[in-house]
Amino acid sequence: MPRLCVCMLVLVLALATFSEASWKPRSQLQDASSGPRTNGALEQHQLEKLGPASHHRRQLGPQGPQHFIADLSKKQRPPMEEEEEAYGWMDFGRRSAEEEDQYN
């Protein structure tokens, strides 16, 4: 029985932690749908309404889809030298096999 209580407590705490990021009061939902705004103005308005409890989130900055795309584009870079060397070795093996066929 105590083990079940501990498991339930851990489950409730985990759900509360994960749901905190997606929870919004109704007033914020109504404000967002009440009128058209630019993305910058909307983000600034939301940051002002968040208050002191979200100090760490404000330090992280906006986390919209456009920021994820920018992060992904940073990760796409030219192949590393090690990969190029590996391709050279594979090519060397292929050329060696072709040369052996020519001599036989």
Curated annotation (Swiss-Prot):
Propeptide: 22-58, 96-104
Localization, UniProt: Secreted
An annotated Gene Ontology molecular function: hormone activity
Signal peptide (residue range): 1-21
Keyword Signal among UniProt keywords: yes
SMART domains given in the database record: GASTRIN
Cellular component GO terms held in the UniProt record: extracellular space
A single BP term in Gene Ontology: G protein-coupled receptor signaling pathway
Pfam families in alphabetical order: Gastrin
Entry keywords, A to Z: Amidation, Cleavage on pair of basic residues, Hormone, Phosphoprotein, Secreted, Signal, Sulfation
Residues with Sulfotyrosine modification: Y87, Y103
Post-translational modifications reported in the UniProt record: Sulfation on Tyr-87 enhances proteolytic processing, and blocks peptide degradation. Levels of sulfation differ between proteolytically-cleaved gastrins and between tissues.
Positions carrying Phosphoserine: S96
Span list, region Disordered: 23-104
Location of Phenylalanine amide modifications: F92
The UniProt record lists the keyword Signal: yes
Record field: compositional bias (Polar residues): 25-37
Purpose: Gastrin stimulates the stomach mucosa to produce and secrete hydrochloric acid and the pancreas to secrete its digestive enzymes. It also stimulates smooth muscle contraction and increases blood circulation and water secretion in the stomach and intestine.
Family, as annotated: Belongs to the gastrin/cholecystokinin family.
Full protein name: Gastrin
Species in which this protein is naturally found: Rattus norvegicus (Rat)
Lineage: Eukaryota, Metazoa, Chordata, Craniata, Vertebrata
Gene: Gast
